[in-house]
UniProtKB/Swiss-Prot annotation:
The keyword Acetylation does not apply. It is an enzyme of class 4 (lyase). It catalyses: (1S,2R)-1-C-(indol-3-yl)glycerol 3-phosphate + L-serine = D-glyceraldehyde 3-phosphate + L-tryptophan + H2O. Tetramer of two alpha and two beta chains. It comes from the Bacteria. One of its GO terms (molecular function) is tryptophan synthase activity. This is Tryptophan synthase beta chain. It comes from Stenotrophomonas maltophilia (strain R551-3). Its EC number is 4.2.1.20. Gene3D superfamilies: 3.40.50.1100. The modification N6-(pyridoxal phosphate)lysine is found at K98.
Length: 405
């Protein structure tokens, strides 16, 4: 990956949805028209002050924004080195960053006259957030979820059902996030007239990567303003976990042109990248096409997508958002692997030092933040996106420790 100078990172994507050589739209002919309709509707909505006002109102009064920045002082003292700050997306309604995006897309669905929304989910947080906004707006909701993920995220499955959603188990492939996304795509092709597909990450064909980014960019805008207001400066480094990468690009985007801020994504290294049991698409993947866009993917020598592994259902995906692929190639961001064990250690450490249970996805970012902090002096700041809360993962962690709850 060779770095090349980029004058303005906010100028991407281009009119065709490309982030450099990544992104674009590689879909069946039956989806070309619906995607063009969606792009046109989104571009009109984002220029409409009434739509923006409705979105901002829901973020404030329904989601509970802004989310605070919290100085994890006891954690920082324990780790040594730089101060670790947490952007508390875990405090949002539904417990994660996902609702920033689902609120925006659901409002767009209603504006387009769609009566039914579908979604894919891995950890269940996007499914819960989609079911939540569907209930809020009176829309039918169907969520596709891999059977493997249903087993490890039973609480979120029940939450979706309580909210009135239908949860469809997906048993094909590895029965995880990529397979759920495949089935949701098939549903959309069949029912495009009345159905809106709320993709939960910054992947998929254009306009999804930019649309999901834009709805999550509130995270970084708030964080940047909060840093300047509370500390009079920007952080020295920022980090977030990266599966598809929606929470990460949400934080990163506001800082992309602040060249003095180091940007590091934490990918799921699973049992270790050397073992092959991981989901580190940038660290160990190659450029290819997955789910309608060109990006880094995990595939074999024949180009077939390989099965992934992560203790975190939300990071268990064989691709990454095209903007992250672009940022990696340009040298603006680094993407490093965090193993299951490192994430679990970070989970327990935050619980013990700060009284906060982070999601397993967020625990990867926390582990990376701790590594960055150790390398830096005490007067520097590492800002970590705590993308979600860990209530959903308690059963998974207990099971790994031999406990039955």
């Amino acid at each position: 990956m060779s770095a090349s100078p980029i004058a303005d990172y906010h100028a991407f994507p281009d009119a065709q949805g490309h982030f450099g050589r990544y992104g674009g739209s590689f879909v069946a002919e039956t989806l070309v028209g619906p995607l063009q309709e969606l792009a046109q509707a989104y571009d009109q909505a984002r220029q409409d002050p009434a739509f923006q006002a409705a979105y901002d109102r829901d973020l404030a009064h329904y989601v509970g924004r802004p989310s605070p920045i919290y100085h994890a002082q006891r954690l920082s003292d324990h780790v040594g080195g730089a101060q670790i700050l947490l952007k508390r997306e875990d405090l949002n309604h539904t417990g994660a960053h996902k609702i920033n995006n689902t609120i925006g897309q659901a409002l767009l669905a209603a504006r387009m006259g769609k009566k039914r929304i579908i979604a894919e989910t891995g950890a269940g947080q996007h499914g819960v957030a989609s079911a939540t906004v569907a209930a809020r707006l009176g829309l039918e909701c169907v969520v596709y979820m891999g059977a493997t993920d249903i087993e490890r995220q039973k609480i979120n499955v029940y939450r979706m059902k309580l909210l009135g959603a239908t949860v469809v188990p997906v048993t094909s492939g590895s029965a995880t996030l990529k397979d759920a996304l495949n089935e949701a795509m098939r549903d959309w092709v069949t029912n495009v007239q009345d159905t809106f597909y709320i993709i939960g990450t910054v992947a998929g064909p254009d306009p999804y990567p930019r649309m999901v980014r834009d709805f999550n960019a509130i995270v970084g805008r708030e964080a940047r303003e909060q840093m300047l207001a509370e500390y009079g400066r920007l952080p020295d480094a920022i980090t977030a976990c990266v599966g598809g990468g929606s929470n990460a690009i949400g934080l990163f985007h506001a800082f992309l042109n602040d060249r003095q801020v180091e940007i590091v994504g934490a990918e799921a290294a699973g049992d270790g990248i050397h073992t092959g049991r991981h989901a580190a698409s940038i660290a160990a993947g190659r450029p290819g096409v997955l789910h309608g866009n060109r990006t880094y993917v995990l595939c074999d020598d024949d180009g077939q997508i390989i099965e992934t592994h992560s203790v975190s259902a939300g990071l268990d995906y064989p691709g990454v958002g095209p903007e992250h692929a672009f940022l990696a190639d340009s040298g603006r961001a680094r993407y490093l692997g965090i193993t299951d064990e490192e994430a679990l250690q970070a989970f327990h450490l935050l619980a013990h030092t700060e009284g906060i249970l982070p999601a397993l996805e967020s625990s990867h970012a926390l582990a990376q933040a701790m590594k960055l902090a150790r390398e830096r002096p005490r007067d520097q700041i590492v800002l970590c996106n705590l993308s979600g809360r860990g209530d959903k993962d308690v059963h998974t962690i207990a099971a790994r420790e031999g406990l039955v709850l």
